[in-house]
């Protein structure tokens, strides 16, 4: 399979996003990456979906890959939602959302709103519905304060690359990838918290079929938080558990 066809997507606030497209099938998947990632890390995922009869479109969310925006920053989580909506408009017809990690929280945040064209189903891989390692209270308090007075301050995200996959080659490639970054900002953190709260409060409004892929050995996103959301979900749902696998299920 060839590499992605690169497209340019303009989000609502005029931020330019790079997107990739694979295949030309009549059925569409909108694929979303995790924090600090880019479309190049999902070529193999897109290839499998194309083989299964799907056309795949994937944006690099603002601040990621070669899209515009500061790394590890968004002024509002809703800006990510707008990035997804702009990509969906490019697709122009009903689609399925497939999302990993941070992309899972962005996907569900998008589904809290009416989408045009509509999303007809969603599949999530270890979504960011909670963090596996809780930050000390003093760090959380500092992040909330800095979000108000210095929201764009770049700080180390403290993500352990060895926790993404059991495959040493995947870890080595991740650590050497020039488009992967290791920073976050206080505003990103508080917007993530707010998005998780909005999801818990509005979950009952999402009714489309949900497929959740969950690793109980995930040391990055909290599998218990994702499982709680799954149990509370009132629409059609299926759950696939992969107990021994690490965070990046698509790279195990």
Where are these regions (language model features)?
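N-terminal cap/lid segment of alpha/beta-hydrolase-fold proteins
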Residues: 1-22
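Active-site glycine-rich loops that stabilize anionic/oxyanionic intermediates
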Residues: 26, 34-37
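Catalytic nucleophile-loop/oxyanion-hole region of alpha/beta-hydrolase
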Residues: 36-39, 65-91
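Conserved alpha/beta-hydrolase
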Residues: 46-69
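Alpha/beta-hydrolase-fold enzymes
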Residues: 102-185
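Short beta-strand/loop motif that positions the catalytic acidic residue
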Residues: 206, 212-214, 218
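Short alpha-helix in the alpha/beta-hydrolase fold that links the catalytic acid
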Residues: 208, 222-231
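Catalytic histidine-centered segment of alpha/beta-hydrolase-like enzymes
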Residues: 245-252
